[in-house]
Amino acid sequence: MNNKTHIVLTLIASLTFILLNSCKSDDDVATSENLGEIDAITSFGGTKNESAQSVVSTQDGGYAILGHTQSMDFDITDKPNESYDYWVLKFDTENQLQWNKTYGGTGDDRGNTIIQTTDGGFAILGQSASVDEDVTQNSGAKDYWLTKLDAVGNIIWEKSFGYSGVDVGISLLQTNDNGYFITGILDVSASGGAGNTKHAGGDYWAIKLDATGNTIWSKYYGGSYTDTPHDAVETNDGYIIVGSSDSDDVDINNNKGTYDFWVVKIDTTGNIIWEKSFGGSGIDEAWAITNTNDGNYIVVGDTRSNDQDVSNLLGAADLWIIKISPDGDLIWEKTMGGSSFDAGRSISKTQDNGFIISGSSRSVDGDLNANNGQNDAWVFKIDNNANVSWQKTIGGTNIDFAYDAVQLQNLSYVAVGESSSDDADLTNNKGFTDLLIIKIK
């Protein structure tokens, strides 16, 4: 072999080695960025029932969780009785618990939503049946109970909103004017004439508050049957509320059949700008909404329909994602799931313009590749066109749910929910149901 041939072959071998290693590096990067590896699964609770309903990424790089607890032992140290209380847990950037506190009275008090406020504290919303201890007022069976906390969980102020029935606070926003916008269920049957008096169930009930929780306005939306809101977003000219409705009158003009996704756009004083129903002839329920970077909105829930707006039902119930315009026009829709029951409960934006979604699944086929028994928590990431980047199911042989998920400042994810399992992925159950935290990297 002459020197020239030797040099050429050496160059080819070197380039091949570099190319192969370059491809390997790219594959490794894609794996670490896209597969969503489980980092840790943790449960908190006592010998009774606990659940996490909401999680928020905090300004210090950590996160805070709101749920409820019934226990008085193990991880719960400040409860005087076994009635349900709100339960807030604050974690630092290393996933270490910084503090946890319970809030409520001697009645049934359960938290639904937590936000971090611009002053570094928190606001928490849910329902309360108490009129003692932390709760100073109650008008009936249950009221909305909104509590403002400082950065270490001390109560600054608290307010109740309700009538003589079961009124449930569900979603909470801090608005651009530093006030609050809260929505939930009005029990029309016990409202003393508020809302739609022909109603057989509940109305959407929206309340705009100032920075200290005083009511600016209060409005009701719905029809003659059951209308249940689950989430809301602020827009540049008002708010969009999403939930479900089986009404076909009063404020609802185009019900598709039984329960639909019902999306209501209102102005800054609560007047309806437009309302749209999405779904088919089966039961369709919207649970969460977020805005997109292209000026539209994505709504997540579940569907049992296979007609009209729903193009492809995969099983008994599927997670259903729709994208709508600022005017409520359907841009696209997609079902995800398998042959059993699958549902979506939350959606939030990620730093790469994608979305993290949480829910639950009973399927082991279709879009799912594992199930440990009954309902498993289901967490997955999509891009702006609903292409799946990764998905994970977490659970044991009993019932496990994920209710919320967010991305943290360090680009990892936290999903929260509840678990009654003590095997497979979950090995440390303390009672009936435990508060569940899933860390994903």
Predicted segment positions?
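A sequence-level/structural motif corresponding to short, flexible coil/turn segments enriched
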Residues: 24-441
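Bacterial N-terminal signal peptides that target proteins for export
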Residues: 1-9
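Gram-negative bacterial Sec-dependent N-terminal signal peptides
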Residues: 8-16
